[in-house]
């Protein structure tokens, strides 16, 4: 069943909140990709929820993003909207916040980085990147799948 949310103030922003409003489970939730319009599989809906990504609305209907489009448009975003890079200590000095208090997402898959992943960036002297007004780095899963030159942006 397709829900419409005409009142912008009442629109659920997360998949979990949408499940509550629609009184359905995460596995039964049906969402389309905002880019390719394909229906997301149950595992893609679950991944979207685990990455704590936000729903977007088109014509008052909620949309998410499929795994293929997420990786593709993350790459496009990295290329088009890269600003600059900083090491962990410089990022702490600039923001006046500890790394653990900053929301830093993986620039490849958009997963929020764990405190351990942020610490690894510091230990291995990998930089964090400012891409489209957001701090990014690499999660462990994507770290394994990328080459060392790719982290230099």
Curated annotation (Swiss-Prot):
Note: Belongs to the high risk human alphapapillomavirus family. The cancer-causing human papillomavirus E6 protein has a unique carboxy terminal PDZ domain containing substrate.
Subunit details: Forms homodimers. Interacts with ubiquitin-protein ligase UBE3A/E6-AP and thus forms a complex with human TP53. Interacts with human NFX1 and MAGI3. Interacts with human IRF3; this interaction inhibits the establishment of antiviral state. Interacts with human TYK2; this interaction inhibits JAK-STAT activation by interferon alpha. Interacts with host DLG1; this interaction leads to the proteasomal degradation of DLG1.
UniProt-listed InterPro entries: E6, E6_sf
Zinc finger (unnamed): 33-69, 106-142
GO MF, any single term: DNA binding
Cellular component, GO, one term: host cell cytoplasm
Role summary: Plays a major role in the induction and maintenance of cellular transformation. Acts mainly as an oncoprotein by stimulating the destruction of many host cell key regulatory proteins. E6 associates with host UBE3A/E6-AP ubiquitin-protein ligase, and inactivates tumor suppressors TP53 and TP73 by targeting them to the 26S proteasome for degradation. In turn, DNA damage and chromosomal instabilities increase and lead to cell proliferation and cancer development.
Any GO BP: symbiont-mediated suppression of host type I interferon-mediated signaling pathway
Keywords, in A-Z order: Activator, DNA-binding, Early protein, Host cytoplasm, Host nucleus, Host-virus interaction, Inhibition of host innate immune response by virus, Inhibition of host IRF3 by virus, Inhibition of host RLR pathway by virus, Metal-binding, Modulation of host cell apoptosis by virus, Oncogene, Transcription, Transcription regulation, Viral immunoevasion, Zinc, Zinc-finger
Localisation: Host cytoplasm; Host nucleus
Name assigned to this protein: Protein E6
Main location, first listed in the record: host cell
Source species of the chain: Human papillomavirus 30
Top-rank taxon: Viruses
UniProt motif (PDZ-binding domain) ranges: 151-153
């Amino acid at each position: 069943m397709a829900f419409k949310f005409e009142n912008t103030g009442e629109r659920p922003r997360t998949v979990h909140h949408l499940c509550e409003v629609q009184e359905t489970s995460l596995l039964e939730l049906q969402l389309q990709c905002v880019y390719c319009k394909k229906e997301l599989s149950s595992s893609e809906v679950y991944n979207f929820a685990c990455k704590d990504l936000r729903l977007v609305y088109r014509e008052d209907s909620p949309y998410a993003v499929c795994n293929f489009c997420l990786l593709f448009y993350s790459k496009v975003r990295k290329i088009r909207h890269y600003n600059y890079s900083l090491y962990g200590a410089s990022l702490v000095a600039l923001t006046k916040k500890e790394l653990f208090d900053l929301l830093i997402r993986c620039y490849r898959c958009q997963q929020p980085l764990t405190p351990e992943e942020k610490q690894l960036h510091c230990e291995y002297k990998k930089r964090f990147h400012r891409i489209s007004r957001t701090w990014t780095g690499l999660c462990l899963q994507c770290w394994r799948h990328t080459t060392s030159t790719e982290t230099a942006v």
